[in-house]
Amino acid sequence: MKNTLSLILALLLCLSLAVPACALPENYVGETLEDFTVRTTAGTDFTLSEALKTHELVVVNLWATWCPPCRAEFPFLEEAWEQYAEKVEVIALTVEAKDTMDVITKFAEQYGMKFSVGRDEANIFRKLGGMYIPTTLIIGAGRKILAVEIGGKPSAAAFTEWFDRYLAKE
């Protein structure tokens, strides 16, 4: 019994040391995001570096069609983006491999998503060690990751406050 307890405690200690070492998405703040190009539901290509030539910030939202918090935050993201469209570009990328472009297009129409929508063909979510969705990144000049947030935002105001904070820094 004593050996079993010692073994369990040793395993728990190892796990507690390993978890902080994991590459959590938040740990990528300050890093440069690899440039990427993805096809959008509009049939056009979205390239991160090109979007940053015309916008101060790019918001990369990683989501899935089956994710309730993702669906809940899209109307808020849309509303905020419409107010900031001249300075902030948004690309929403599904991380669900099973989501076809037809499924994504219908989903975007259903949720009134007018910003760019596509699939995470560049595997951003995986490269950032993503485990939870939605995960949203703010990218600034030079493709620098300024912020990473896991979980949905509860209002358009939450997005606009976030945009204002990082526009002021750029």
Predicted regions located by residue number:
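Structural microenvironment flanking redox-active thiols in thiol-disulfide oxidoreductases
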Residues: 71-111, 119-127
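N-proximal helix/coil linker or "cap" segments that precede and/or mark the start of modular domains
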Residues: 19-35, 52-54, 106
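Hydrophobic beta-strand anchors of alpha/beta hydrolase catalytic cores
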Residues: 59-60, 90, 136
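Thiol/disulfide oxidoreductase modules built on the thioredoxin-like
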Residues: 106-114, 119-166
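A short beta-strand-turn-helix
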Residues: 37-58
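Short pre-active-site segment immediately N-terminal to redox-active cysteine/selenocysteine motifs
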Residues: 56-58, 62-66, 132
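Positively charged n-region of N-terminal signal peptides that target proteins for export
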Residues: 1-7
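Bacterial N-terminal signal peptides
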Residues: 8-18
